[in-house]
Amino acid sequence: MKIAIIQFGGTNCDMDVLHVLKDVVGVDAETVWYKEENLTGFDGVVVPGGFSYGDYLRAGAIAARTPIMDSVKKIAAEGKPVLGICNGFQVLTEARLLAGALTTNEYPKFRCHWTNLRVETADTPFTSKFRKGEVIRMPIAHMEGKFYAEESTLAELDENEQVVFRYVDEKGRVTDEANPNGSLENIAGILNASRNILGLMPHPERASESILGSDDGRKVFESMADYITENF
């Protein structure tokens, strides 16, 4: 098993993801520069956080049009798991691999703090280690994290259980106060229709060791590794 971690100009969470995958979860992983056009030999992909290309035009817009993304789309078409974290989520929406868009936070300022999330479904390659309804903790760090989609798209995401994480309070309740950025329906992470692509704004790699304040995020990577082992 080998997982690719995509690097763009401005990516800054790649080494954190590499550390978690290799040293915490114990799987083989390798960083791959955006100019590469071949991901042969990889069984999964992580598009990590950062500020790719300075967030010019829109967050993730330039990165979504780099050569490596054609290979990411091919990996996804093969059913292999693709995980987009923060800026990676933005890249995946810009690449039309995920529905909706990430826009400027409702209160236009950079938000960097811990959030409570509710696991909406455990039936995914990324959440099999969780329980449905479980409340977990992960930090956010973004300026453009407000999830937006048309009403019909939101209804489809709900109907097909493609919403994976929602921002909630400590008791697991969906409230306006628990929503850090104004995301519609408190959405923090979603799947594609085929359920092998996940994008989320919170950072699981920053919550993968107890010394950091939470190790809940580790289960995202462990679930992904289990899925690859069982299917590829």
Swiss-Prot record:
Pathway involvement? Purine metabolism; IMP biosynthesis via de novo pathway; 5-amino-1-(5-phospho-D-ribosyl)imidazole from N(2)-formyl-N(1)-(5-phospho-D-ribosyl)glycinamide: step 1/2
Major localization listed first in the record, in broad terms:
cytoplasm
Recorded GO molecular functions are: ATP binding; glutaminase activity; phosphoribosylformylglycinamidine synthase activity
Q: What is its EC number?
A: 6.3.5.3, 3.5.1.2
The Glutamine amidotransferase type-1 domain sits at 2-232
Sorted alphabetically, which keywords does the UniProt record give? ATP-binding, Cytoplasm, Glutamine amidotransferase, Hydrolase, Ligase, Nucleotide-binding, Purine biosynthesis
Q: Give a yes or no for keyword Nucleotide-binding in this entry.
A: yes
- Catalytic activity field: N(2)-formyl-N(1)-(5-phospho-beta-D-ribosyl)glycinamide + L-glutamine + ATP + H2O = 2-formamido-N(1)-(5-O-phospho-beta-D-ribosyl)acetamidine + L-glutamate + ADP + phosphate + H(+); L-glutamine + H2O = L-glutamate + NH4(+)
Instruction: Note the InterPro entries from the entry.
Output: Class_I_gatase-like (IPR029062), PRibForGlyAmidine_synth_PurQ (IPR010075)
Does the keyword field hold Transcription? Answer: no
GO cellular component term, pick one: cytoplasm
Return the SUPFAM superfamilies for the record: Class I glutamine amidotransferase-like
Q: Which residues form the active site?
A: 86, 203, 205
The compartments listed are: Cytoplasm
Q: What Pfam families does the database record attribute to this sequence?
A: GATase_5
Per the record, the GO terms for biological process are: 'de novo' IMP biosynthetic process
- What PANTHER family does the record point to? PHOSPHORIBOSYLFORMYLGLYCINAMIDINE SYNTHASE SUBUNIT PURQ
Function, as annotated, reads: Part of the phosphoribosylformylglycinamidine synthase complex involved in the purines biosynthetic pathway. Catalyzes the ATP-dependent conversion of formylglycinamide ribonucleotide (FGAR) and glutamine to yield formylglycinamidine ribonucleotide (FGAM) and glutamate. The FGAM synthase complex is composed of three subunits. PurQ produces an ammonia molecule by converting glutamine to glutamate. PurL transfers the ammonia molecule to FGAR to form FGAM in an ATP-dependent manner.
User: Whom does it interact with, and what assembly results?
Assistant: Part of the FGAM synthase complex composed of 1 PurL, 1 PurQ and 2 PurS subunits.
- Its name, as the record gives it, is Phosphoribosylformylglycinamidine synthase subunit PurQ
Organism, scientific name: Methanosarcina acetivorans (strain ATCC 35395 / DSM 2834 / JCM 12185 / C2A)
